[in-house]
UniProtKB/Swiss-Prot annotation:
InterPro entries named in the record: Ribosomal_uS19, Ribosomal_uS19_bac-type, Ribosomal_uS19_CS, Ribosomal_uS19_SF
The protein's role, per its UniProt record: Protein S19 forms a complex with S13 that binds strongly to the 16S ribosomal RNA.
Membrane-spanning intervals of the chain: none
Pfam families for the chain: Ribosomal_S19
Protein name: Small ribosomal subunit protein uS19
Gene Ontology molecular-function annotations: rRNA binding; structural constituent of ribosome
Domain of life: Bacteria
The family this protein is said to belong to: Belongs to the universal ribosomal protein uS19 family.
BP-aspect Gene Ontology terms: ribosomal small subunit assembly; translation
Lineage: Bacteria, Pseudomonadati, Campylobacterota, Epsilonproteobacteria, Campylobacterales
Amino acid sequence: MARSIKKGPFVDAHLMKKVLSANSANDKKPIKTWSRRSTVLPEMIGITFNVHNGRNFVPVLITENHVGYKLGEFAPTRTFKGHKGSVQRKA
């Protein structure tokens, strides 16, 4: 079920504070965050976030296409090694 329109999008307060200060100072340094649940807002366009995926931080550059998604959607947490295929024997 989607979030109610009257509530608005969720962004952690500490993350929004860092975004606003980076915008006012024209700072291009990446913002390190563990907040995968925060929604990407138009104020975040052009900022690079280092999003934690459980092991390390994945750099994510926010563009217009990212608005409305969650930060965690751009930092995958699982690595897919592939299904076991059939072994080809030498003839």
